[in-house]
């Protein structure tokens, strides 16, 4: 086994025992990144920074070493990293190098982590297939025939990099499923924490009331370790919760006897593939075998989640993206003689934003406009409150976690949705958006393969602030499923 194939927990133990140095571990990952160029997962590799941090980690070994000392990670391009290109996969931020570090990356570096570079993603996190990126598509390391498959989105580069062992783990962000859907498509673990658990400061904003950063890892234990380092109150983020961060790893007892697992009847969608239905049934059996009580629940407003999400998210995006005007940073269009300031704004935004981002900004501006604010935006906010109430009532009735499919299918081919109605792509988020609208924690766990040999995941949804309990349920599911398959190396 090469060092880059280790989990965080395994590498941590090997580093502590002196069986492995952080420099050797980092070099193994950098070699894998070079070989993994066809995956287009890393878009800004930072080998010099990585090796400097690895040498510092080796020098620090011992008592004062942090929880992630010497662990090489990939960072989604949405996180601002000081002096390193951070452009949210958009041409409008081409050449932008922040003067500051995001809170999440600061915390990771304080814990001793090594940054291997920045990862591909959908432009401004708007997409479910990593096809809206200015860097080109990220490619799923899993393959069927000779088709190039999507790794999912928007955290597609993060998912591909972890699944292909280019790094030990990666950061992602999740606005409507952008950690959980790519994790399911690539056979890895991805957790979206409770809204406010992880600081959003220094993360390029898409939809401020929905965005949440989280870890993408090779195991549930790794997710617990990485989340522990990322989470915590941040006075720089007004939505960050001042709540103590428990020891997530210590919560992985594997004991869920007597816990109630809710199965929402509304998630049985018309036309859902039989494989997904069978996987969900298997997940129920695994949790029941571990001593959990399986109960049917109702989340009656589920069917309104996608339309509500695709009003609220674009509305917030159109407001957040108004700042990209070519004045202070990023791309500025070349102006003709006699062009004024309005021409500069229009040309800059037309050249800098990709088609999907333009579409969502237009939708968002429309639903916030005077004549339509009540008809669309306010109605969507009311629906959101009802969706949250559905979950609150389920948890108040004693449910500890909710089990659902993570995605409506396995990974699809790159370019397959290119000519489809955009709504067909939006349907990828059908099982995940409710969790963001309600601000709850959700985790995707790989449980099996479909008939084509592609990974499928199940989603567990937890009570607010109970990531510890959620991770423990996921740990039980992971152990019972025994998913150890890896993509066959073709790159």
Curated annotation (Swiss-Prot):
Family: Belongs to the amidase family. GatA subfamily.
Biological classification of the source: Bacteria, Pseudomonadati, Pseudomonadota, Alphaproteobacteria, Rhodobacterales
Annotated Gene Ontology cellular component terms: glutamyl-tRNA(Gln) amidotransferase complex
Assigned EC number: 6.3.5.7
Domain of life, source organism: Bacteria
Function as written in the Swiss-Prot or TrEMBL entry: Allows the formation of correctly charged Gln-tRNA(Gln) through the transamidation of misacylated Glu-tRNA(Gln) in organisms which lack glutaminyl-tRNA synthetase. The reaction takes place in the presence of glutamine and ATP through an activated gamma-phospho-Glu-tRNA(Gln).
A GO molecular-function annotation: glutaminyl-tRNA synthase (glutamine-hydrolyzing) activity
Keywords in alphabetical order: ATP-binding, Ligase, Nucleotide-binding, Protein biosynthesis
Protein name: Glutamyl-tRNA(Gln) amidotransferase subunit A
Substrates-to-products reaction catalysed: L-glutamyl-tRNA(Gln) + L-glutamine + ATP + H2O = L-glutaminyl-tRNA(Gln) + L-glutamate + ADP + phosphate + H(+)
BP term (GO), one: translation
Protein species of origin: Cereibacter sphaeroides (strain KD131 / KCTC 12085) (Rhodobacter sphaeroides)
Catalytic residue list: 76, 154, 178
Cross-referenced NCBIfam families: gatA
Subunit structure and binding partners: Heterotrimer of A, B and C subunits.
Enzyme class: ligase
InterPro entries linked to this entry: Amidase (IPR000120), Amidase_CS (IPR020556), Amidase_dom (IPR023631), AS_sf (IPR036928), GatA (IPR004412)
């Amino acid at each position: 086994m090469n060092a880059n194939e280790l989990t965080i927990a395994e590498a941590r133990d090997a580093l502590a025992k002196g069986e492995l140095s952080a420099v050797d571990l980092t070099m193994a990952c950098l070699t894998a990144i070079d070989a993994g160029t066809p995956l287009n997962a890393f878009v800004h590799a930072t080998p010099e920074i990585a090796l400097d941090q690895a040498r510092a980690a080796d020098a620090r070994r011992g008592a004062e070493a942090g929880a992630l000392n010497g662990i090489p990670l990939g960072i989604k391009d949405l996180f601002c990293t000081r002096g390193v290109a951070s452009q949210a996969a958009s041409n409008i931020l081409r050449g932008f190098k922040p003067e500051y570090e995001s809170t999440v990356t600061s915390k990771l570096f304080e814990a001793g982590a090594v940054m291997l570079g920045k990862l591909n993603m959908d432009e401004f996190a708007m997409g479910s297939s990593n096809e809206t990126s200015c860097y080109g598509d990220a490619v799923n390391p899993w393959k069927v025939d000779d088709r190039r498959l999507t790794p999912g989105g928007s955290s597609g580069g993060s998912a591909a990099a972890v699944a292909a062992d280019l790094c030990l783990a990666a950061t992602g962000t999740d606005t409507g499923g952008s950690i959980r859907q790519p994790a399911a498509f690539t056979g890895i673990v991805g957790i979206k924490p409770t809204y406010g658990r992880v600081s959003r400061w220094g993360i390029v904003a898409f939809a401020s009331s929905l965005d949440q950063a989280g870890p993408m890892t090779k195991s549930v234990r790794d997710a617990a370790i990485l989340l522990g380092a990322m989470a915590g109150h941040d006075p720089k983020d007004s939505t960050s919760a001042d709540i103590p961060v428990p020891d997530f790893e210590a919560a992985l007892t594997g004991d869920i006897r007597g816990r109630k697992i809710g199965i929402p009847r509304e998630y049985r969608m018309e036309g859902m593939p039989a494989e997904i239905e069978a996987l969900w049934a298997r997940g129920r059996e695994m949790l029941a075998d571990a001593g959990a009580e399986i109960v049917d629940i109702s989340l009656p407003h589920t069917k309104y989640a996608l339309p509500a999400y695709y009003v609220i998210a674009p509305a917030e995006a159109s407001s957040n993206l108004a700042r990209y005007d070519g004045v202070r940073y990023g791309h500025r269009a070349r102006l003709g003689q006699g062009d004024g300031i309005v021409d500069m704004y229009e040309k800059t935004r037309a050249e800098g934003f990709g088609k999907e981002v333009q579409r969502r900004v237009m939708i968002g501006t429309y639903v916030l406009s005077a004549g339509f604010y009540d008809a669309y935006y306010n109605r969507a906010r009311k629906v959101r409150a009802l969706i949250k109430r559905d979950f609150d009532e389920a948890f108040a009735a004693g449910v500890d976690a909710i089990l659902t499919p993570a995605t409506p299918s396995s990974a699809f081919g790159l370019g397959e949705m290119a000519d489809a109605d955009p709504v067909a792509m939006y349907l990828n988020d059908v099982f995940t958006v409710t969790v963001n609208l309600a601000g709850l924690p959700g985790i995707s766990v790989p449980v099996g393969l479909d008939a084509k040999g592609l990974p499928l995941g199940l989603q567990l949804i937890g009570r607010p602030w109970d990531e510890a309990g959620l991770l423990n349920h996921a740990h039980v599911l992971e152990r019972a499923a025994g998913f150890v398959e890896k993509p066959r190396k073709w790159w």
